[in-house]
Structures are given as C-alpha cells and as structure tokens.
Amino acid sequence: MVFRIASSPYTHNQRQTSRIMLLVLLAAVPGIAAQLWFFGWGTLVQILLASVSALLAEALVLKLRKQSVAATLKDNSALLTGLLLAVSIPPLAPWWMVVLGTVFAVIIAKQLYGGLGQNPFNPAMIGYVVLLISFPVQMTSWLPPHEIAVNIPGFIDAIQVIFSGHTTSGGDMNTLRLGIDGISQATPLDTFKTSVRAGHSVEQIMQYPIYSGILAGAGWQWVNLAWLAGGVWLLWQKAIRWHIPLSFLVTLALCATLGWLFSPETLASPQIHLLSGATMLGAFFILTDPVTASTTNRGRLIFGALAGLLVWLIRSFGGYPDGVAFAVLLANITVPLIDYYTRPRVYGHRKG
C-alpha cells in the first residue's frame, strides 16, 4: 500500500462539497421567490435554462477529459453557477443569452482552469460580465416591479418573450417595460445614474415611481431583504463565514454615507446602495465562494472591504449602474496577494 504525504494544514470537514452547494441552493429560495413575485415568471424560466445548460456543458467537458460525469455533477457546483447567473440577468432576456453566458461560465471560467477548486475567478460573474459587455442593451432591460408596472406578463407570455421576443398578443419588451407613469423603467441604480447625468436633482429623482419603496427602490428593497434572509440562514448553518459579508456591507455603507454627506446632490444614499441591485446577493452568495475568495480570516475581511469599496466606486463614478460583478472579479485578482500577506506565521519561523 502506498501512502501519500500531503502538506499541512491537516484539517477535516465532515461536510462534503455537494452538501455545502445544496445549502446555498436552498438559501437562494427566498431571493428567487421575491424575484418571481416582483418581476414575474421569467426568472424561473431563466433558472431552468441556465441549470440545464450548466449541467450539459459540464458533462460535455468531463466526457472530453475522460473524467467521471456522474460523480462530478453530483457536487452541485454547476447548478449553483447556473442559478447565480440566471438570477443576475433580466428575467425576459433572450434564451440564447443565458445559454451563452452559462456555457462560457462553466467551460471557459471553470473547466478550462481544471474544474472546481482550480478556477481563480467566480464563474457566474465571468459569464455575467461577458454578457454585459457584449449585449449591454439586453442586459440592462429589466422589467419594472409589478407594483409600478402597467403590463404584467404571465407564465406563457414570459416564455414567448424569452424565446421569440413577443408576447402572445404581440407586445414587445418596450411595452412590458412601461411603468405607471408611461415611461420605460430601469433599475433604481440605473435610473439614479442616468438622471444625475441628465442634470436632475436628487429631490426630483426620488419622486420617480421606481423609488416608491419604503426603504429604497420599489420591489428591489424586498428582493435584497430576501437575499439577506437567505444569507443569514447560511451563516446560521455555518455554510459561510461572517467576515466577507460583514466587511463588504460595512465598507459599502460607510463609503456611501460619506459620499452622500459630502455630495448629496450627485451621489446615492446608503439605503439605495444597500437595498438595490445585487448588493445582498453579492455579499452572501457570490463573494463567499470558497474557491475564489481569501482563505484566512484577516484576508476575508480585507477581501470583503475591497469589494465593497469597488462596488461604491463603480456605481458612483463608473460607466455601469451596478458594480458587483466587476468588483468581485477585481477582488478575485488580489486573493493570492491578500493570502500571502495574511497567512498565519508558522510557529518557530520568521515572518516572510
């Protein structure tokens, strides 16, 4: 019998990868339910398309690499990648976009590096950024939440729009995006950025229907709170650690508060930053990816804080309304450096 001598640390975790991934999938249920409630059945269709695409793409690559397909697919990582991408894109985006983004995420951003545990970047966010850069119009065509929408597509209409671009009655995305004020709606972050650049005051912007929510943007505040609830459950289950979400949210809130105090006429308030866009999804479900995040506790705090700073900078001064995906990928780049300088010193050895 040949024994393999592995390098330290010699740790043991009874939880398998598949179970951790399953817990994350279960924790996503409140967020998915909220998106279905406010944005319609399109989200469910996108999740199904992304899940099937992710499994097929992973199976194809594993077959080509002559690895066990069944054993690898059981780790649920491909399903999670597909789900995270599906809930990040507009619910009525064309079917081929979610398929393209998912296949790119699984094959290029994950399997090309060697598979789970080898990829330096979050695969779902790679797929998202590729779609955002390639198809910016489609990727920013979000429907207004149901509470301010004029035309609410049903399940059949959602399928029709995703696969053909039109509802059963002949309506298109321009019709479906109309709000109660007769104007095509965008996300709270997109609306704020566009309106500020157009010279509108913050007082005027806050009167728009998209900001009719109690805390932040209509619908979006509840979606973010739902993702927050799922994230808290993950913490309770010890599936993730608190360092990254806390440092990310605290840094984002601190930067947003300081910016808002110094320039209230051009920068969004803290509650808009915290409860709009993909803030809570990013904090608890994307940044906490154990493969692409820092591995030390101090490193996790730095990693989360860096991502929070980058999100605020991109949202406030960048060309894109929501900066979570870009912030995640930029923070991923720094992980080796962060881990190098925050790794615990071995007893009896000098630091360095």
From Swiss-Prot:
GO terms for cellular component: plasma membrane. The keyword Amino-acid biosynthesis does not apply. InterPro entries: NqrB/RnfD, RnfD_bac. It comes from the Bacteria. Its EC number is 7.-.-.-. The chain crosses the membrane at residues 20-40, 42-62, 89-109, 123-143, 214-234, 242-262, 267-287, 301-321, 322-342. The keyword rRNA-binding does not apply. Part of a membrane-bound complex that couples electron transfer with translocation of ions across the membrane. Required to maintain the reduced state of SoxR. The complex is composed of six subunits: RsxA, RsxB, RsxC, RsxD, RsxE and RsxG. NCBIfam families: PRK00816.1 (NF002011), rnfD (TIGR01946). This is Ion-translocating oxidoreductase complex subunit D. It comes from Escherichia coli O17:K52:H18 (strain UMN026 / ExPEC).
